[in-house]
Every structure is written in C-alpha cells, then in structure tokens.
Amino acid sequence: MASSLAAQLSQIAAKSTNQLDLKAQRLSHSQSLIFDRKVAGTQDFDTVYQICFEGFQELCQLDARFNSFERTIFSEQSKTEDRTQLSAAQNKELDVVLEAFLALVGGRLLLSPAVKAVDWLIRRFRVHEYNTEFTILTFLPYYTTPLFLNLLSILPEDLTPTFKILIPYKKGLLNPPRHPLVHSATTNRAFLAAVNNYVLTVSRQQAHHHALLAFWAGIITEAVAGMLDSSRSGRREVEKQKHEDIILRILPILNDGFALKNVSELVIGCYMVSVVLAQKSSLQDKLLDGLMEAVAGSWTEETLESGLVCLAVLAQQKPETRLPRRALKAILRLDDIVKRLTDISSQYQTSNLLLGVVAGCVDDLTKHKDTARLELLPRVFQTQLLGELETSKAMAMVLHAASNAHRDGTMSLDTQACLADLVQEFNQSEFLQPIFQKTIAESTFDTAAIEHNLQTVIVTAPAPRAVEDVVMGDAEKVVEQDGFSSTLEALVGEKLFKSSFLSAQSIPVFDRLVQAFALAASSEEKTQVFSDLAVLGKSEVSKSPQYLSFFIRVFSGPYPIGTRAMALNIVATFLTSTSNLDLDFQAILPFLLVALADPSERIRREAAAALAAIGGIYKKHKKGENVWGRDTIYGQEKQSKSVQWLPTRDAQKVFERAVLPSLEECIFDPGHISKVLETTLRGASVDPNASELKKPLRLSFFTFLCSHAIQLPLFTPKLGLLGLLNRIDKAGGTTRTKELEPLLKAWRGLSEQEVSDICEKQRVPVSEVESQMVTIVTPKEKDALTLLLSNVSPYSESLRSTFVAAIFARVKDIWARVSEDRQVLAAEQLFDIALGLSDSALVNNCRNLLRSVELPGSVLIEFLEKIPVSLTDMEAVGPAPKRRRTSQSNMIAMTVKDEAEFGKVMEKMTFILELVDSSSPETHPELADGLFQTLAALHHFKSQIQSGMSYLLSLTLGSLLAIVNRSKESAKAQFDTSVIRADLVVDCVRTTESPQVQNAALLLVSGLSVIAPELVLHSVMPIFTFMGSSVLRKDDEYSVSVIDQTIDQVVPALIQSLRNQKRDVVSGTSELLLSFTAAFEHIPSHRRLRLFHALITKLGTQDFLFAVLAMLANRYAMDKDVLVLMTGLVSDASAPVELTVRRVHFYCGDSFLTKLQTYYKYLDLVTDSLKAKPSISQVLLGIGSDDGREPQKVAVDLLRDLAYLFKHSSLKVKMAKAFASEDEEVIGQIRALFSRILEQVLTIGDSVQSMKLVGQANSDVLGALFGTLTLVDFLDTIEVLLQRPSDELRRKVLRLLEGRLRQNPERDGASQIRVLDFLPTLVDIVRSSPDILLKHAAVACIDRIAEKYGKKDPSRVVSAAQVVASEACIGQEDDRIRIMGVLCLASMADVLGQAMIPALPEALSRSLALLEVSLEKGKENSRLHDATFSLFSALFVHIPYMISGPILDQILLLSFKSANAEDCEDDGRQEALRMMARKVDMAATLGAVDRNWQYAVQAGPAAAKETLEVVSLAIEKHPKSATGKNIGVLTSILFKVFDLRREQLALGSKATFEMADIEEIEESVNDVTIKMIYKLNDSTFRPIFTKLQDWAIAGLPKKDTQGSLARLTTFYKFLQVFFGTLQSIVTGYASYIIESVVSILGKASPSDKNTKSLWLATMRLLRSAFEHDQDEFWQSPSHLTQISKPLISQLAHATNSSTAALVIAEAVPTITELAIAADSTDNHKDLNTLLMRFLRPSSGPTGNRVAGGENPHTRLAALKAEQSLTEQLGEEWLALLPEMLPYISELMEDEDENVEREVRKWVKQIENVLGEKLDDMLT
C-alpha cells in the first residue's frame, strides 16, 4: 500500500508545476536557444523581453504578417503571463497563437532576429515543453545546423514515441544524419503523419518556405518508396494488401496537397510521391485515372513542367492509352503542348501520354465542333517523338476513327478535310510513309470506307515504283479477270521495235512492255509468252539488239527487285541456251558489273550467272569478232559507234582473269566488284594464281568502260558505272579525268530543267549525280584544281547552282591532296573570283572555300602583301594636291572620292585578315612581318579617313597575339623581332574606342614585353594612362584577364628597367599610379581590391603601398568605397600586401612592420605636402603644380583617411598579437616604429596649430592611433602626454580616453585595475585644474570609468563622487561642468548604490539648487534640468530610503514649476516622478502629494495630472497592505481632487483649468479610485463610499447651489465608472443613491446649461447600474417604483429637435436597460403604462400641454423608446401589444410627419418580430 502511494506521489511530483519548487523553476528559466544556461538563469523577463522584442521588431520589418502578434504574445502584458496559472481553455487559445507564430517564423530561423523572437516563446511560454511537437517540426528542416542542436539540448527528456528517433541524438548532443530521419518516416507512422500534418497546416496558413517543403518532399518520397519496397512479399495477395494499406495512408495527403495549388513546391512534392506510387506499386487503372486528373487539376504556370512529367510517368503505367477526360481537357488547354512534351521527352518517356492525346483527339469525331484538336495531330507526328511502333499505333487510331466515323454520324467538312490532310501527310512524308504502308499492310482496315469517309485516295504502295503500283492497283481485279491477258493483247500486234531499248531515256512502248512483264514475272509460262512478243524480236537476237536491250534496261532500271531479277534470269538463260552462237556479248559487261554492286544479293546472284554464261560463250568461241550490238546498242546514232570496243580476245582475257575468278565473292559482298576493278586496272590481279592484265589491255578495258559511261543514255546504270570508275585514278597510262572529261563537260552544259527531268524519269537524286560527275576529276591530275574551277569560271548564268556547289565541294575535298604550288595558283584564282565579281554567284562559294581549306603560309604572305598595295592605290584616287588640307599632325586628311572603290578596298582587307585569323596564324610565325606592315598601313590609313577600323585592327592584333603567345613558349622568338612596332600597338590602345582592339593590343604588349622587353618599355607608359580611362572600367571576364596579364607581365619589366637606369621607382611610375587611381571610380566594385592588390604586389608593397594609399586619399577623400579598398589593401594579412621589411622569426612581425613602415612613409608624405617646397608630394599628389590642390586640403584628406585606416584595419589585432609574442626583438622594433609614428602625428599637430581643419584631422589620427593600443598601453601613453604643458593636448587625449571608454572597452582584470589606478589622476585634475574644459573632459572620463568599472571596487569611486559633488565641480558657475558633474553623479548612484551616501548631502543640496537655477525665468537650462532629474531618478531607484519628506516636497514643488515651464522637456521629470512613485515608501510619497496638492493645482493642469499619475503608480506598484495602511492620506488626496470642479467653478473667470482639463483629471482620479478599491475589501471601502456620498450631497451649505451641483456632477461621473467597472459586485450600492437620483431627476434638465452635465452623468450612471444587475435588485418593486416614473418622465424634456436628440441618445437607452433589468411581465406593464402616457397629448407629468405628449418631439422620443424596447425584448415586450394598439392607430394618423414615419417603422418592427401583419388588429 505504501509503495503504491509513494509511486503515485512521485508521478504527481514529476508533473507538478508547483511555484514553490524554485530549483525546477530556475532550471526551466535557464533554457534558451541563444544564451548559455548560466547566463540565461541570471536574466529577468524584462531583460529577455527587451532582447527578444528587438528581434521581433526586425521580423515585422521583414514581413508585416508578424505585426498581429505584437498585441498578443509580444505585448508588454506577455511578460507577466504564466502558463501554469492559465486554465486549460486559455492554454488552448494560447497554443493556437504560438503555433501560428512558429509556422510563420519557420522560414526565417536561420536569421538572428527570428531566433531571438522564438527564444521569447521558449523562455516565457515554454513552447518546447507545452508545444513540443510543433516546435520540433518547425526546426526539423534545419536538422544539420547548430540551431537544431541547441533545440535538442532543451527539449524534455520524455519525448513521445513520435520523435523517439531524436532521443539518442539528444543524449549525445549530435545532429541527426538524414538516413535515420528517412528510416523513421518509413517505419514510424506517427512521425510521418506528424510531418505531413505540419506541412499541410503551415501551407494552409501561407507560411510555407523552401527549406520546409524541400525537406518534406525528399523525406516523404524516400519514405513512400521505402514502405513500398519493404512490403514486397512472395505472396501476391499479401503484397497487394500491404500496398493498398500504404496507398490509403498516402492518398489523403496527396489530395490535400493538390488542393493547395498556390504552394508550388508542395504540389511538386506530391507529384514526386505520385510517381513513386505509380512506379513501385501496381495501381488500378481507376486509381491511376484519379491521380492523373488530380495532377492535371493542380498545376499552375510554376508547376506545369513537373506536372507534365508526372502525367507522362503515370500514363506509362496505364495498360490502356486512353487518358481520363479531365486530364485530357487540361492538356489540350495548354499552349503548344507538343513543344512542352518535346522538352521533357529527352529525359522521360512520353509515348503513352502522346498516344493518349492522339486517342482523345480522334475520339467522337462526329461530335467535334471545331478542328482545334485535330490540328494538333500533324505536329505530334512531325516531331517524331514517337517510336516506329508507337507511331504505327497512333496511325491505326486515326485510321480506325476515320473508318468508323460513318457509323456514329456525319463528320463536319472541316473535320473531314483535316483528317484527309493528315492521311496524305502519312503518304508523302519520308519518315512516316514506310510506317504507314506497314500499318496498312498489317491491319484489316476497310480502305474503301476510309477513302469514302475522307473523300481522298490512299496510295498503298510507294509512289516512285510504278510497277508495284500496277500490281497493287490491280490486285483486286486479278481475282475477277486475267489482267496479264488484256495487257498482252494490246502488245501482240506491235511490230519489232526499230532500235535498241537502251537508245533513249523515254520510249513509250517500253513503259507498256515493262508493265506487262511485271505482270508476267511471277509465272514462267507467262514469261515465255511475253518473251515471244514480236516487238522484242527474240528470233532476231543475233542481228538486232531489241530483245536483250529490253531486259538489260529492266534489270538496270529503278524497278522492283523481283522484276529486275526475272529480267536478269531471262538474260542468263538466253545466254546459256544460245552458247553455240558465235557472238561477243561484251556490250552487256558494264551493265552486269553495275548489277554486281547492287545492294540486293538476288540481283548479284543472277548477274553472276549471266557473267558465267558469257564466260562459257568465250570459252567456246575464242576467235570470233562478232560483237553483239556493236553499232546498235545505244541506237543507230554515233553514240553506239563512239564506244571503244575490246577485241574479243581481250574481252575473253578480262573475263577469265578479272571477272570470273571473283564472282563468288561478289555475290556476297556488293563492294567487292569495285575492289576487283580497282586492282585489275591498276595491274594487280585479284586471284594470285591468275596472271595480270598487261598495260595496253588495262588501258583498253578502262577506255571501254569509260566510253560506255559517256555514251550510255540512261542515268541509272550510268550512275552505277561512274560509282565504279570513280574509284580508279589511273589505268594503263591514262587518268579517269582525261577519259571522262567529255562526260563532265556534257553534264555541265545541261540546264537545270533538263537535269531535273532526267533525274525524275530515271529516279536518281540530283545531288548524287552531281557529286559523281565532279568526282571524275581526280587529285592526281596535275591541273585538277584548275580543271574544276574552269568548269565554273568564267561564270555563266546557265550554270546550275547544284553543279557549282558540287564543284566547290570537290575542290575542298581534294585540296589537301594537291601540291602547294597548285594550291597557290588555285588560291590566287579563287581570291580573284571572290573579290573580282561582287555580283557573281561564285563569290560566296569562293570565299567559303578559302575559309574552309588550310592555306599554306606562302599564300597568306602573298595575301597580306596586297593590303599595303591596296591602301597605296586607294590614296592615289584622293583629291588633287592643291585641294588637300593638312591636319595638325601634318598628315593628309584624305577624302575618298569613289565610295564604291573604298568599299571594295575595305572588303578586300577584311577578307584577307579574316583568312589569316582563321588559318591558325600561330603556326605561321613568318606572317609577323606582314602583319606589322599591315598594322602600320591600317594605322596610317585610319588617321587619314578618320575611321576607327576596329574590326580590321582587332583581326591584325589577334593574329599577331597568337604568334607572340606561341613564341613565348619557346626559349627563342620564332620570328625576327626587329620587325616589331611597339609604338603602333600602343597607339592602338591609345586611339581606339573598341574594347576588343584595346584588349588585344594590351595582351600583345604584354606578350612582347616578355620576348622583346627592350623594344617595348620605352612606349609602355601611355598604355597605363589609357587603361585608367577605359579598359579598367570593363567588367567582363575577358577584360579582367587582359588587365591581369598586362599587370603581371608589363609592370615587373618596367620596374626592373627603372632600377637598371637607377631612377626612383616611385617617381618613375607616378604616371602609372595616377592612371589606376584615376580609374578607381570606373572599375567595377567587386574587382577593385583584387586589381589594386595585384598592382601593388607587382610594383612592390614596401615601396609603393603608401603612395597608392596617398593618391587614393588625395583624389577621393572620404569616399566610402575608396576607404573600403584602402582598408582591404592594408588589412589582408594573408596577401603579399604585408611583405617583410626584413625577415623576423615571429609569424606576424614581418607583415606588421611593413604596415607600420607604410604608415610612417604616408605621414612623411603629409609632412612633405605642408612644406614650402614639397618634393615627393609634388610628384605623387601634384602639390605646387599649376593644376594641383591646396596643400592644406590635401593634408586634411590624407589625415582623415589615415584615421579611418587606423580605426578599421587589422592594425589593432596585429599589435596585440605582436605584444603577446615572446620575441623581444620584434616587440622592440614595433614599439620604436609606433613611437616614431606617434611623434610624427604630434609634430604635425604642433606645426598646424594655425590650420584648424588640418589640426582637427590630425587629432582624429591621434585618436585612431591610440585606438590601436590596448587599454593598458593607452593609459600608459596618456599619463605621459598629460605631463605636457599644452592644455589643448591634455583635453584632446582625455576626450580620446572618454571615447574609448564609451565604446566597448576591455574587461579583463589587468585593464580594470589599470583604469581604476588612473582614477586619482582624473580626480586631481577636477580638484585642482583651473581649465574648465579640461575639468569637463576629466569628469566625462570619471563618468565612463564609474559606469564601466565602478562595481569592481566601489570604494575607489566614492572619493571621486565626493569631489564631483563638491564646489570644485558642480559648484562651479560654468553650466557645462555642472551638467557633466550631475550626470556623472547619476551614473555613480547607479553603480555605487548605498555606497553613495557619503556624497549624498552635498549632492542633494547642490542638485536641488541647480534645478531651481535651471527653472529661473529667462535663464532656463533644459540640459541642466534633465541632468538633475536623471540624478533624482537614480537616487530613487538605489537609495530611496535616504530621501526625506522635505526633500520630496522640494522635488515636487520644483517638478510643478518644471511642468509649467515651456522650455523644459517632460521625459526626465516624468521618469523621476515615476521612480519616486515606484520606489519611495508609499506613505512618504502620498504624504508629499497631500501636502503639495494645492501647489500642483496652482501650477496648472500638467502638474496636477502628473501628480495624480504619481498616486496612481504608487497604488499600482505597492502591495495591498501599503494601500490599506495609507487609506487616510489617500482618501484625503482623492477628496481634494474630487473637489477640483467646484473650486474652479467658484473662481469663475480666474479659473486656471479649462473644463476639458477638469474632465480629464476627473477621468484620472476615477481610475485612481478604482485601483484603490481593487486593493481594499468591502468593509474598508463602504465607509469611504458613504463618506464620499455625504461629502457630495450634504457637504456644502444649501445656499451654495453651484458648489453642490459641481460636487454631484463629479460624484455621479465617478459612480458611472464605479458601476461600469465593478459591475454586479457593487449593484447593491445603488440603494445609497436612489433618493438622491430621484431628486436630481426632478430638477436637472438637458436644456439647462447649469444642470446639463449633471443630467448626463445621472443618465449614464443609471444605465451602468441597470446594465450589470445580476442580483434582481431592480426587479424589486420598491426600487423599480421609486426610479421608473422619474426616469420615464425625462421624455418630457424632448421639446425641440436638440433636446429630443439628447433624450433619445441618453434617456431612451437608460429606460431600455431598466426594462431589461426589471425582467417581469408585471414590471413591464407598469413601465409601458408610464411610457404610453407620452404617446398622447396632454399627458405630461405636470399635466400641462408642454410637459405631456402634446409636443410631437415628446411623442417621437416615446416612440423611439418603444422601438428600442421592442428591439431588445422582442416578444416579451410585445405581450403588451393589446394595450399598445389603440395608441398605434392614433399615432398612424398623427399630424406630425416624423411621428407618423416612426410609428410605421415601429409597426414593421413588430410585424418582423411576430411574423404576422398588424393590419387586421389595427382596423
């Protein structure tokens, strides 16, 4: 039993928030995000609030949404909120506000103000304990930061299971990695749910931020993927069930997320989760559709791309391609959906989504109102986003829709036209046609129905293959009749064709024959019948070529493989069967060789059989010379006769040695025959065992083939034969070019139309024929380039553009394979064409060719030599010498006479320089001479025509730069450096405005300074002048690299040159330095430090840093950007800015010494500038020059900048490091240098005493210099300086000390001791010095020391306080020392507390005297006034018990006088009075007020108000017991204040208070009285109340009517506040005043100005009393009867519009509240009876007409009362309606319009309440 009870008690104790558990409270209070536990534990809530509120205010400036929290959790009241004292409901309301703030601040937690603000929630509201989950989730996105670690450290130990993952990291104080968080989200449902709910809550509040949503999206995506992976199971049903559970948990999150469209990152996160669900689980089609619709419905412009990706992924998971309707509509509404899908298709599969779009577009074609959807389809197919299979599916969808359209209705014409165009696109597109044909072939579509529905024709075979068209076109007819028979019948009657079928390109009978042959090709019987046709002349085959030429043309032509193979088969069969004929069939050889190169193996096999047959014939007939088709093969014309035939024996050798041995390989390799011909004609046999063909035979064979290629009219076999021959450059002593040149010339002569017709008929590409024709020219031909160019030059308009393009392509192709001398000739020819015929079509081709081939150096040199010549020729066309004018530079200002000629010259130069630039000039160093000559010519020409010529200069300089940069890589220059013209390059920098030219020239100068410095440096200085005005302004990366390179390479060489000449380097480079400093303002800000840093490094820090600093200071003075740069230059410890003067062992000594030396040289420069004859400053700063500044102004600027550097550079840190080292040598050197610098500053100060501005600037330097010292060193230095006789110096150093102490002085023990040791020195100055200003400075220092260090040893400060309070300080006549002394005493009081008592008597007496002096009329001193009150405030706070009553009386009297003074500020006085009220004993304070109230009234309203505020604050801040003890004096004060109205009215015109002032004071005293009442009990207060009542009602003689009315008015105003504030608690007090109220109601009137205020107070008092009655006080008949009649009788006062308005506004609401309080039917009836008397005339309370209802204003007021009662009481009041109806009827006919209008309103009001009309009741 005991153990159980103990366990329960321990649990209760664990959860207890008992206020007496001080240890737990301290622990809780010390938990903070930003303070250490020890620090936090010592802070009170005022301090914490002040710190945190500052952060909150900064947040409000960032986001106005934070402002609303200023009235709640960041209000002043929040400092006293204690959650342990709040009820559960109040805590719940508080939670809502706190969590709203946390949600909003979450996005800014990495900002310091946000952390401060949140710390208030932790310190005051303990959100980490009461709102743990929300707090953790707010910080969780920052789990890797130290901030999250701080939170972990203050979280409760008993974290819920939701956050169990954080427990080990909390214990170890480690940041959690990402993996455990993901694992927790995967396995811990509560954690994932909490994160999801938090994210949705924050997003709904529009408080989302990137950190949160990025964190959430990553966590939930990985968690869902992990859950799905871990739920996989071997049993499908189990896995399915687990997946469904996961999906059911996730879908609500997605649903809520998709609903928040405006939170784009949240929506994208939902897309990611959707993708994971789709890819890792088998979602049902219905669920996928739902997800897709949700995705499509959620996207905005920001999330559209991600939404489409998600939709594409989801679509890929669907088994069907159809998209849900809503998703489809959303997609089709997008702009340019195809482009959007194209953009994402490179990373994601979009095929299913596109198929879904296609399906949606062709769905319900008959219902389409427009063609918008169908117009999308062509773009879908044209973009080729779909693969071949998907494209086929999409085509099938279109065809299916078109074929079934007639079943669902009728398509519109627009729809029909769109679909027809789309199908034609399928037919005609190169990409789509094969897929379409395959789709048609593999499907069962009703083609006829599609054609009928679309009114178009579907071509089901490729258009170029006419024979297949015949076969396909007649496919259906074959079944019905024999198409071959009908075709054959038309040919049977044809006679033998007159010539060979190879004689012409177009033979009509051939076209008919080939169609018939195609029909017969599948049957041997039909083929035999066809072969026997007379038109073919089979029987005459040995004499005429018709039979074989027909089949040769077929197998060589563009026909189907089957048809061609059958033709070859017939030829082979014929040759085999007629082997006995003594014929030489070499004429067929070229065609069969081409067939051996055919891509089809079947063709190659049949061709091999035919060749074998011919070979068999040759074996049998070796000596015959009867060549078949010798003169007829290509017709009877010269074409046949021009063929170079082989002797039969030679032909037999060719077959036996070259063709027949390789037939087997040729069958399997289409490229083998070309290799065979190539090796054969070159003299190498393919078969090792076969003997080679001899050279004459090779020549004969080659010319035989070439002649056939030339004479053959048909281009299909001609092109094939050329393809074989163009692989052979030479054969048997001749070249391909020589043999086939006639063919090239003939081809050149054809017109474009002829070529087009030929290629169209022969079905060969024009480009391929052109290419093969020009390939005839071989690079091994000596004049190959000349020959090619001769075909296009001279240019003829008849030349085809395709031929010209092919010629130039061939030239480009063989250029590298011809000799350099031929290249030179060709280049010259091309150059002449390129620049000679500006209107020729060859120009661009020539130019492009020259740009694209590799030109040899000799060509480039020759081209460059043309530029000076061209410019010289150009000058020759200038004006006559007599009309020339010379410019200032004695150059001819030439005007160009012929603009066209000038344009040609410019074009020529541009082209040449572009060629050089693109020809890798670095590989041609020999071009340097020509380029410099070109540069000279350009520069000369530029100066004459006043043109920049920037592009040409840029090209020239760029080429030179490339050559120079390559030369820099080698030990010796690769070109003759004597050709260098550095002056021209520098002139380019100086005179051009083009950034490109400037940069190139600068880089060139940099490069030249490396390889030939002696030729460059004498010209280099203008570069820096120019850089300062131009290049340094650039901000692009290239310009920056140019500047860097120029500085790196030119400056060191320049410095070395100056040193070699033994010249002063600083003076010698002054122009350079001036250029850079002048350019400062134009240099991009982020480049400045780096640029100047590099410059100083290259120049040498030791010699140049001071000069650069001085020149910057001289030019820009205190410009902020310049100061930042200067600080950076001297503070960068890691940079070479701080190079050593001489090596020292200590790590920071060398850099520090350099810095001090820089400052020393800088001060030397200042001194030099002030000399009568300046030296170095004249060179660097322009002192003494004509355009130089005044020396004093220069010195001021230099000194001010130096002071800034001392304050803001790293000098102080380096000084401390140096003195902390153990290297005495370093310390000694630094001390010596510092002393020299200090001596310099002091010397300058002594020398410039007559120069005020320079002296001030020097003082600033001195102060800043002292600022670099530690406080101890500083004081040591000051003690020495105080021994100097100069009071000005002594004042200066003390002011510096005060400034140092005012900032953040050192707090270490040594510093504190040293400062306190210095205090006597200051005290001695105050006591003995006659210099008031020096005293003032000393007192200021004492003030700082007391404030900062006084608590360390208060006893040492007391003596200083006594001196300050003495005659030596605040007893002086000078106001400055008085003010400073009083302020110092105030600070000492704050520090010393009761230790201040020894100095107190003198301090108080003198300060009161000083206050009185400061208030003397005409001698007001507001500063002295405020200082004195600040002293009183400090005394009240720290030693209030030492302030006696008389002193308080004096302070109050003087404060009254101050309040009435116009020139005195109020803040200090009011603060002192507040401190008196808070801290001084309440009895003493109230006693002083009571004694001096009359003086406050005499002083005026302001003094009276402030005095009342003292009383109010004293009651508020002191405990209840103090109020009870002092009730007597408090009552006395209140009675005096309550009597103020009477007193002022009694004075009449002599009154000092306006009525507004009186009312304001009465409001204040009412508030004070209420505060007093709160601290009293009823037994204490009730006697006071009765006393107050008696005082108000009977306290004056009866004859003093005005006084009685004044007191009653004040009393009733108090009662209004009394009943209104304390409400039902004091309702019973009304019994005391009923009789008085009734009396007042009988005699006060709103129309009487004397009683109006009293009447108003009475009405409002009664209203407050009635309103808060909860004890049925006014239901009592005795109370009700007593008050009702006098109150309702007040309606009679409404006799005119003004009084009626007042009665309606005041009396009517009071009557209404009385009726509500009466709350019974009987009481209501009595009230109504009284009220209705005023609805009729002659019913006034006095019986006369004026007082009754006779006056319409009275009736109107009564009606308003009835309306108000009806509105407030409703049906309860309308129970009296029967009594009212007669009155209503009469009033509806009242003679007064206003009365009649209001009664009708009342009737409507009644009807609305009752829900029925009153018409029947009123009739």
Curated annotation (Swiss-Prot):
Entry's Gene Ontology BP terms: maturation of SSU-rRNA from tricistronic rRNA transcript (SSU-rRNA, 5.8S rRNA, LSU-rRNA); positive regulation of transcription by RNA polymerase I
Chief location bin: nucleus
Pfam families from the UniProt entry: BP28CT, HEAT, HEAT_HEATR1, U3snoRNP10
GO cellular component terms given for this protein: 90S preribosome; membrane; small-subunit processome; t-UTP complex
Superkingdom to which the source organism belongs: Eukaryota
HEAT repeat windows: 583-620, 1045-1082, 1269-1306, 1313-1351, 1775-1812
Keywords: Membrane, Nucleus, Repeat, Ribonucleoprotein, Ribosome biogenesis, rRNA processing, Transmembrane, Transmembrane helix
Topology class, membrane: Multi-pass membrane protein
Single annotated GO MF: snoRNA binding
Transmembrane segments: 945-965, 1001-1021
Gene3D superfamilies registered for this protein in UniProt: Leucine-rich Repeat Variant (1.25.10.10)
Purpose: Involved in nucleolar processing of pre-18S ribosomal RNA. Involved in ribosome biosynthesis.
Entry's family note: Belongs to the HEATR1/UTP10 family.
Subunit annotation: Component of the ribosomal small subunit (SSU) processome.
Protein's name according to its UniProt entry: U3 small nucleolar RNA-associated protein 10
Organism the protein comes from: Aspergillus clavatus (strain ATCC 1007 / CBS 513.65 / DSM 816 / NCTC 3887 / NRRL 1 / QM 1276 / 107)
Name of the gene encoding the protein in the UniProt record: utp10
